[in-house]
Amino acid sequence: MGGWSIALHGGAGDIPFSLPPERRKPREEGLRHCLQIGIEALKAQNPPLDVVELVVRELENIQHFNAGIGSVLTNSGTVEMEASIMDGNTMKCGAVSGLNTVMNPISLARQVMDKTPHIFLAFQGAQDLGKQQGVETVDSSHFITEENVERLKLAIEANRVQVDYSQYNYTQPVQDDAEKELPLANGDSQIGTVGCVAVDSHGNLASATSTGGLVNKMVGRIGDTPLIGAGTYANELCAVSATGKGEAIIRATVARDVAALMEFKGLSLKEAADCVVHERTPKGTVGLIAVSAAGEIAMPFNTTGMFRACATEDGYSEIAIWPTA
């Protein structure tokens, strides 16, 4: 086995190269901060499962990302957050959806995994578990920010749902198929799903993903993030966290397909991740981060950009948005 490795993302989408510094830098700093937390946790020999939960909790606490405190609003002006987490060593996993009072959805997903015989709990049942387990909760109004109220207003006026990191009004019509070509505009939506994958020096793997979903989504809509095998997956070969257009990710079972290509076709992590992103999903829809048991890292995307960061035990680290080669 190689040394430890970690990767995290803050969402993929049509991120313009002209993204203003005041919108770009807070996210880069957020990624840098969370990456360092993950590095220190791995150096302290914390289990990868604990590391990915810790890092995603921190990302959920940064308002510049579409998760936790930064979660976007439904067409009714409410928040419905979702998250999932998976341990590659045991294949245990937990997922939650429809949360509007839980400060850190990823930690409730961990409680589902650790404290129940189930994998996926949603809406009031999930929040009731959170109360039983002492998960931090707040009034739902805590998540209704002026910025997201304005974003929802613009989306409703255009009768559209806005996807991760689409340009200002780069949205998709509510009734259109998600795979159709979408109109472009200028700017940046300032939203992005978050995720983290990690492996320790013994090859133990874990993955975690959290999101607020789509701006102006229908109440009750569930995306790829809490679906094991779509937005999140980990086994003994790799750990994967996906981001982008949820419906496209679900159709392609993105996260599981990376692992399946490694398992059944013998592809390397990079080959498998590139195949899924560039050959199996529509252009402009998907990005992912992945690590292998050997410590390899892959961070492909078929969108304009993806906020991402990674580090390895040998000292390599990277924080990037757009293609680097």
Curated annotation (Swiss-Prot):
Residues bound to substrate are R221, I222, G223, D224, T243, G244, K245, G246
Q: Name one GO biological process term.
A: proteolysis
Which residues carry out catalysis? T193 (nucleophile)
On whether Ligase is a keyword of this UniProt record, the answer is no
Q: Give one GO molecular function term.
A: beta-aspartyl-peptidase activity
Reaction it catalyzes: Cleavage of a beta-linked Asp residue from the N-terminus of a polypeptide
Disulfide bond annotation, renumbered to this chain = none
Q: Which CDD domains match?
A: Asparaginase_2
Please tell me which top-level EC class this enzyme sits in.
Answer: hydrolase
Top-level lineage group:
Eukaryota
The catalytic activity of this protein is classed by the Enzyme Commission as 3.4.19.5
Q: Which UniProt keywords apply?
A: Autocatalytic cleavage, Hydrolase, Protease
In this chain's numbering, which residues are marked as the site (Cleavage)? Answer: G192, T193
Post-translation: what modifications? Cleaved into an alpha and beta chain by autocatalysis; this activates the enzyme. The N-terminal residue of the beta subunit is responsible for the nucleophile hydrolase activity.
Q: Report whether Hydrolase shows up as a keyword of the record.
A: yes
Summarizing the function annotation, the protein's role is: Acts in asparagine catabolism but also in the final steps of protein degradation via hydrolysis of a range of isoaspartyl dipeptides.
Q: How does it assemble?
A: Heterotetramer of two alpha and two beta chains arranged as a dimer of alpha/beta heterodimers.
Per the record, the similarity remark reads:
Belongs to the Ntn-hydrolase family.
Descriptive protein name: Isoaspartyl peptidase/L-asparaginase
